[in-house]
Amino acid sequence: MLTRSGYIVNNPPPEIKKELTVRAVVNDDFGFPPPPFKVFRPTKNGICVPRYYGTSKLGEPAEDKRPVPTRINTRFHGTLRDATHQNAALAAAIDAGHGVLSLPCGFGKTTVSLAIACKLGYRTMIIVHKEFLANQWEERIKQFCPGATIGRVQQNKKEVDNDFVIAMLQSLSLKEYSFGDFDSVGTVIVDEAHHICAKVFSQSLFKMCPKHIFGLSATPNRKDGLTKVLHWFMGPTFFAVERENQQDVEVFPIEFECPRFRDPPPCTRFGKLSLSTMITELTENRDRNKMLVDLIKRITRGTRQLLVLSDRRQHCMMLQQCFPKTSGLYMGGMKEADLTESSKKKIIFATFSQAHEGLDIPTLDTVILATPKSDIVQSIGRIMRETKGKKNNPNIYDIFDQWSVCHAMYNKRLRVYKHGGFKMPKMKEEEPDDFARGQCLIKL
């Protein structure tokens, strides 16, 4: 039976509960695994499971007791682009009715999603996990769906009686709402949907079971093995495009060496590698920061707009102080007006967490990866958006350090560059400017 909460299974066999009890997989070298958690809820006579887990495991439900959702009459005022597969994505979404849409950054997931919502014609809830993403969605709704009413579900706000309802994932997960609060919602769109695989956030989708549900993510596959949770709630991926044959993107690997790398990286008292301590140590290395400042000066002599990404807020703030007039910060907790002002600067210092999901500055064309990272697909996608007046091809400056764990991360990044068809110039001994050639050994 299908209800407003999900797929009801009466008297479930033990193997179902066992399969729906999951644990994130982590690298044992970096720490201990988290405790398992349940992706189901108890009911009077059984359990409530994610809808598409139920249909794939037990078949279509015999009954559908969900309330009838509210219809809206909102038109989409925009043009979808074939070059980024937007029309094909729309057609696939309407045909599937649910599932995961995977498009690279800059391919217009937001635009396509609004076209889908208008085509289906139901009150639509958009679930986001960051305040600035909620603001971006509101701007896009006003742009592509003029006249549509917009509400918020956030903390004590519960403005459901609107065409579009933008809901914060944290509020949906942690706050108790009245029975039937979201019965009128017919379409749910989850932005950066891979977040709902986490223990707390997965509870948000037990508070509704809409007619249509779509998950948006450029990188739906999680490294912790919990991708299956996404598909239990959303269904399979119905449309996916990968960025490839991007020969106009140029990568400049820059190797940094210092005597500290001759010693082992920092470890915890349990003998495990302390990744966080290692990152902090790198961001506080004076010679390394001097190299970064010199590199930023070289890159910004011309017309490029540069994004500098680091894992540490303090690192971003320290580097930004070296360029007070031409740079700005783009980090969580900043006011919308300050983020907008920073987006106009020639140099933007941002945390990976902020840039990884939702940073939307189409004029960016260059990025420096200032701290080691394995998963960079979303981050480098921020400089690949097509926009009018963009003159420079995308450039990626990849800083890699000489600890073995940093080499392992770098090799993962190399696979991303190779898969995308990016251009990686080789060092020539006669080339006077090592930075211009891309591969250089820096000894400061």
PLM regions: where:
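Walker A/P-loop
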Residues: A96-L120, M125
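Conserved helicase ATPase core of P-loop NTP-dependent helicases/translocases
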Residues: N135, A148-D161, Y177, L307, ...
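Post-DEXD/H (motif II) to motif III coupling segment of the RecA-like Helicase ATP-binding lobe
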Residues: G186, H194-E255, Y417
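Conserved RecA-like P-loop NTPase helicase motor core
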Residues: T219, G328, G332-G420
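A conserved SF2-helicase RecA2
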Residues: K228-P253, C258-T268, V377, R385-L444
